[in-house]
Amino acid sequence: MSNISLIVGLGNPGSEYAQTRHNAGFWFVEQLADKYGITLKNDPKFHGISGRGNIEGHDVRLLLPMTYMNRSGQSVVPFSKFYQIAPEAILIAHDELDMNPGVIRLKTGGGHGGHNGLRDIVPHIGPNFHRLRIGIGHPGSKERVSGHVLGKAPSSEQSLMDGAIDHALSKVKLLVQGQVPQAMNQINAYKPA
């Protein structure tokens, strides 16, 4: 099992999107950078913000695409190819409509599941990367999805998402050590307090 050496957070750039549900992947990577003292800097070559640092003795790169969600592949694909990072060593954190706030799941492989950020990545690097799916809940009807993902969660939901992200942050050490099955068991067993 590969050690995770690239952790990507999906979201939209700009202060107007910073607190929206669609930016849950950004929240995860930004908090990970804070936890491990990794500086995130503008990286125009790869249309993103990136950083490199030591996580539990392992060299890890972080990436936030600044391309807007549905063009995430324009950042992730050239970045991973330039640094020769195999899909199996990539973790992509993203919001997940089909899971309630407070639910978080680590998954390996699969399709894009309707997620526009993943939809732009899978055709280029294949499906074999790992996904950290951060539940944001579904608004109930397809017509309301856009407003939901681009809206800000009420504080009760936000605290559930924050708790799930905190839990996943504590398991990153397993991921960078290549202990993906153990990380999956521990992350997927999470229940909000």
UniProtKB/Swiss-Prot annotation:
InterPro entries in the cross-refs: Pept_tRNA_hydro, Pept_tRNA_hydro_CS, Pept_tRNA_hydro_sf
Stabilizes the basic form of H active site to accept a proton, annotated site positions: D95
Coiled coil: none
Binding site for tRNA: Y17, Y68, N70, N116
Record localization: Cytoplasm
GO cellular component terms, A-Z: cytoplasm
Record keyword Hydrolase present: yes
E.C. number(s) listed in UniProt: 3.1.1.29
A Pfam short name: Pept_tRNA_hydro
Primary location class: cytoplasm
Subunit structure, as described in the record: Monomer.
Name of the protein in its database record: Peptidyl-tRNA hydrolase
Organism (species): Acinetobacter baumannii (strain AYE)
